[in-house]
């Protein structure tokens, strides 16, 4: 890769499990990251999960960022399932504060398919084809990655519907 070695050119991952002991899992995760090459470590970011039992933004800040300095990517849809009592704004603030100076934080935005379809059998975690928005960044200069099934078409439609964003 010819991109600079920074979280701006990130490799985004989830911890994704806890094996009945979050503290021990976080420790093993951080130790594994420490064994990676600097080129990889400098690009890694970690994202909150979409299950209540897994990793929320505040848990990632405390267990990963505060230990090894890895930036946290805030995923707005995932936050709905693992909010730990925080509003979206509060979780976004926590995640943004983990990013190094001079690097624009990345956030993920998607909407549940159920929001756009009247099919109760669809999981609330399934991404919709498009997003209606608006996407709230609460004044932060962040890069928003839209996660939608229609990919680039979803981004183009959003930009047409929200030209000031």
Model-derived regions, located:
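Active-site acidic/histidine proton-transfer and metal-coordination neighborhood
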Residues: 1-71
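Active-site-proximal loop/turn and secondary-structure-junction residues that shape catalytic pockets
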Residues: 15-19, 48-52, 76-80, 111-113, ...
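Conserved, mostly hydrophobic/aromatic
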Residues: 44, 75, 144
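A general structural signal for well-ordered alpha-helical packing
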Residues: 57-61, 77, 89-92
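Histidine-acidic metal/acid-base catalytic patches
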Residues: 70, 81-165
